[in-house]
Design a protein with these regions (language model features):
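Short amphipathic alpha-helix used as the core "switch/output" element in two-component signaling
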Residues: 49, 71-84
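A short, hydrophobic beta-strand element within the central beta-sheet of small alpha/beta folds
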Residues: 85-97
Length: 145
């Protein structure tokens, strides 16, 4: 009997220097998608290293990191904001006018204030961000590993 083809699972990288927030969001995502892969990084450099080491479907990025600005990491992840090769959802602790728009102008699909974001909100944003990037031409989406 032929074996079923293996369906690739969703891989999400969660980069957040706040241990409590990172664990909370990661736990929710793991519960919602038990077959998915949720990787965690506590700072920008380790997050970028993980991102470069394997194929990811989405990166959830906190703007407040211990080693650098989340915007620096965002620009590294999405060098051409109009042609994102990876879905990125940004989280922040700041309620600041214009911050969300700046994140979007730099390639993030969405930006949420952590205190007002549920795990369900984040999950929906991840799915929408992946769908959005999936609509891009393939040559704009895929990067060599």
């Amino acid at each position: 009997m032929p074996q079923k083809p293996e369906i690739p699972t969703t891989s999400v990288l969660l980069i957040d220097g706040n241990h409590t927030d990172r664990i909370g969001f990661a736990t929710h995502l793991k519960n919602c998608s038990p077959d998915g892969t949720i990787l965690e990084a506590m700072d920008g450099q380790s997050g970028l290293n993980l991102y470069r080491s394997r194929r990811m479907d989405c990166v959830v990025l906190a703007l407040e990191l211990t080693d650098r600005s989340g915007f620096e990491v965002l620009v590294d992840l999405v060098p051409i904001a109009s042609k994102p090769s990876i879905a990125v959802v940004v989280l922040t602790n700041r309620i600041q006018r214009g911050l969300h728009e700046i994140a979007r102008q730099n390639g993030a699909y969405a930006c949420f204030v952590k205190q007002f974001t549920t795990g369900n909100d984040l999950e929906r944003a991840i799915l929408r961000a992946m769908a959005f990037v999936g609509q891009m031409p393939k040559e704009d989406r895929y990067r060599p590993i």
